[in-house]
Amino acid sequence: MSESEIIWFIFILISGVVFLTYFIQVRRRRVKDEKRKKEAESLGTDKPLNQYPQIDYYRCIGCGACVRACPEGGVLGLVHGKATIINGLKCVGHGMCAEACPVNGIKVGLGDIKTRDDIPILSASNETNLPGIYIAGELGGLALIKNAITQGNKVVNDIIKNLGNGSSEDCFDVVIVGAGPAGLSAALTAKQHNLRFMLIDQQNAGGTILQYPRKKVVMTKPVEIPLFGWLKKHEYTKEELLDIWEEIQQKFQLKVKTNEKLENIEKMNKKYKLTTKSSTYLASNVVLALGRRGTPRKLNVPGEDKSKVMYKLLDAETYQNEDILIVGGGDSAVEAAMGLARQPGNNVTISYRKSRFVRIKTRNEQLISRMIDDRKITVFFDSNIVQIGDRDVTIKNDQEEFSIPNSYVFIFAGGEPPLPLMHKIGIKFGGELESDF
């Protein structure tokens, strides 16, 4: 064999080994994605709640760029050579998958919502089937701070176009329900155009951000806040965002009427009467800038009414040398558990009704796994809370019922979105948009 033949033989051999190695890795990854897809379908986690990537399978070339671009991890995978949604519940709609696709084969949106009984039917201007009642923010199905701010501005601009002769002393141009990013944006736009408006919320300004644990990092995209200016960074901590909301309120004298939980909206002579727990308001238009979390979901177990039971963690540093139980397995639960486990002397336990964490971000999954391996956090999967005592909690799993010492219980079982209220008002979900007037 000549020297050139030997060189070609070695080249072909090395190329074959490299190709075979690559083929095996790709094959393993795709088999793994197929398995994850089937598991997600069986658990019901394949279906997204908000906006999600809609993949054009005719354009998709199976390059995996979208899979690698997703910052949440685990949302997308490659099955049968095409990109597909694996864990839709993890998707929050960043849209980086669409930006990364080299063939423009992905759009991020809500898709066909005709069968979605949790998404209200909205016009292009975010108006419901009830003329003058608008929805802005995640209640309409679009997550992310940027979307909320943009929609808050958009709906009030549409109200301005259709505003009649103006308000009277007993009637507002618009009442804005919810003081999160969407509500604050709507209020700033109303102030910018000298509308007579009222901004109300059942808690303080901040919306869903108030529920986040201390120093939680929130991803967003650059967006312009009416009157205030641009949010230019891609990441903010909870505290940074709340400082911005506080600065906005002070700078523009934006008053939020707190402790006003909306109970009903009724039509009154082409106006709307809003009833809260403590007040009534009359308005020509209404902006519902409510979050999807709504009222915290309860376990309905004995002892849940004790003062040591809470549904949100504001500052982990205030809890030290305590026996703490976290109930739930989503990102909020995991982040709270990790924050508390980092405090001196805490003994942190998680009780989760499923067999493993299925909804959390990849970064959280890696961090919590490490802390469990290091025995900084104890987890009881496939378990439920039976009873909450003064100094202990009774837990039941498939094998036994047992008690653990306990000082505090944090329940992160999700929230009950305000869908019954919206049905009561007359807002339609699914089907075709029809006017009731």
Which sequence ranges carry the predicted segments?
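Short Fe-S-cluster ligation motifs
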Residues: 89-108, 124-139
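A Rossmann-like FAD-binding core segment of flavoenzymes
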Residues: 46-47, 215-222, 230, 235-283, ...
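Ferredoxin-like iron-sulfur electron-transfer modules
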Residues: 39-62, 75-93, 113-124, 139-140, ...
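Non-ligating segments of multi-cofactor redox enzymes
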Residues: 1-59, 63-68, 78
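FAD-binding beta-loop-beta segment adjacent to the flavin cofactor pocket
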Residues: 67-69, 113-134, 214, 437
